UniProtKB/Swiss-Prot annotation:
Cofactor: pyridoxal 5'-phosphate
GO cellular component, one term: cytoplasm
E.C. no: 4.2.1.20
Species the sequence originates in: Ralstonia nicotianae (strain ATCC BAA-1114 / GMI1000) (Ralstonia solanacearum)
CDD domains: Trp-synth_B (cd06446)
Reactions catalysed according to its record: (1S,2R)-1-C-(indol-3-yl)glycerol 3-phosphate + L-serine = D-glyceraldehyde 3-phosphate + L-tryptophan + H2O
Name used for this protein in its record: Tryptophan synthase beta chain
Function recorded in the entry: The beta subunit is responsible for the synthesis of L-tryptophan from indole and L-serine.
N6-(pyridoxal phosphate)lysine found at: 96
SUPFAM superfamilies: Tryptophan synthase beta subunit-like PLP-dependent enzymes
Family statement: Belongs to the TrpB family.
InterPro entries: Trp_synth_b_CS, Trp_synth_beta, Trp_synth_beta/beta-like, TrpB-like_PALP, TrpB-like_PALP_sf
Length: 403
């Protein structure tokens, strides 16, 4: 049984979630983080700030996003009812924009005219470029060159929106390398630059701040589910790369002990193959990108190359709050392979007329595995974190089709 987490109030003042989180950064960044922490503490409860944030979410993003009962998919899988939280319907096509708006509003109040971001699948990059255009800010996005190749359409979108995209050639040329480069930029240009991190990782206050801006997802669900289904779900399921869409839907439910929280990681070609990105199910605690969390590392603490069909889950770490929720027994984490995710992707397209992101397809795949083991009156709520337009090339390529 999960240990009872009495009224959840993490992180502590130093950004710790139990033994995870914290601030492991070069001295050169500690001033910037102190400044950010102070600004966030000052504005997070400021009525004017909240009013502007909520206005943008409603009128620019199109929130609240609906919840949809996937009846044909439910029938196909058998068992429990499957509901989808439609983050794919947000402007820019994913959950990422919820967080970017919050951080960009903070950047403006801090007088920083330049924003930088890292991106894997390109969704966070597109959201950042979009909001930078909306507010007239300079924008630079760092992206691993391998991801630039995989996500050509999103790269072009960012450029259309006025951002400069910098391909990163170091390491595995994916998300972790882009994050390293973005941090280097921030150290150099800290006076006029705000670093918009796209997930619940990084040094404090990022994991807390990103979670708070994404929590709008779960807050809406708590209102919508009783209206739609008559009660709260039995389980909430979300994919986990860094883990911001999952934290956004989990956080408001943490104190609801009857709601099971399930995070779905990328098992790639299978956990035993070594080619995966499942930090929580296949990793061990260590320090990466300024925080202590579960990582995919070898005996010497060197980061292992990760693999996933989905660029957005292809990250060797995970948000520290997920690490804590796993150890505390409040959330459970499972793996879904490339093959299973691809099957769920095709199923949703054909049965519901919704093309999901490959990331979200991992959560869907697990819901379809879990549903038949449960009675028909049980309810599974899946966070459909993004739409699949960006994955057309990847999926077509796997089917031997050249777009």
């Amino acid at each position: 049984m999960p240990r009872e987490i009495a009224m959840y109030n993490l992180p502590d003042a130093h950004g710790h979630f139990g033994p995870y989180g914290g601030t492991f950064v070069a001295e050169t960044l500690s001033h910037a983080l102190d400044e950010l922490r102070d600004a966030y503490a000052r504005y997070q409860h400021d009525p004017e700030f909240i009013k502007e944030y909520e206005y943008e979410l409603k009128h620019f993003v199109g929130r609240p996003s609906p919840i949809y009962h996937a009846r044909r998919l439910t029938e196909h899988c058998g068992g429990a009812q499957i509901y989808l939280k439609r983050e794919d319907l947000n402007h820019t096509g994913a959950h990422k924009v919820n967080n970017v708006i919050g951080q960009a509003l903070l950047a403006r109040r801090m007088g920083k005219p330049r924003v930088i971001a890292e991106t894997g699948a390109g969704q966070h990059g597109v959201a950042t470029a979009t909001i930078a255009a909306r507010y007239g800010m300079e924008c630079v996005v760092y992206m691993g060159s391998e991801d630039v190749r995989r996500q050509a359409a999103n790269v072009y979108r960012m450029k259309l929106l006025g951002a400069t995209v910098v391909p990163v050639e170091s390491g595995s040329r994916t998300l972790k390398d882009a994050l390293n480069e973005a941090m280097r930029d921030w150290v150099t240009n800290v006076a006029d630059t705000f670093y918009i991190i796209g997930t619940v990782a990084g040094p404090h206050p990022y994991p807390m701040m990103v979670r708070d801006f994404q929590a709008v997802i779960g807050e809406e669900c708590k209102v919508q589910m009783p209206e739609l289904a008559g009660r709260q779900p039995d389980a909430v399921i979300a994919c986990v790369g860094g883990g911001s869409n999952a934290m956004g839907i989990f956080y408001p439910y943490i104190d609801h002990a009857s709601v099971q929280l399930i995070g779905v990681e990328a098992a790639g070609e299978g956990l035993e193959s070594g080619r995966h990105a499942a930090s929580l199910t296949g990793g061990s605690p260590g320090v990466l990108h300024g925080n202590r969390t579960y990582l995919l590392q070898d005996e010497d603490g060197q980061i292992i190359e990760t693999h996933s069909i989905s660029a957005g889950l292809d990250y060797p770490g995970v948000g520290p709050e997920h690490a804590w929720l796993k150890d505390a027994g409040r959330a459970q984490y499972v793996g879904i392979t490339d093959k299973e995710a691809l099957q769920a992707f095709h199923d949703l397209c054909r049965m519901e007329g919704i093309i999901p992101a490959l990331e979200s397809s991992h959560a869907l795949a697990y819901a379809c595995k879990l549903a038949p083991t449960l009675p028909k009156d049980k309810i599974l709520l899946v966070n459909l974190s993004g739409r699949g337009d960006k994955d057309m090339h990847t999926v077509a390529e796997l089917s031997g089709i050249d777009l």
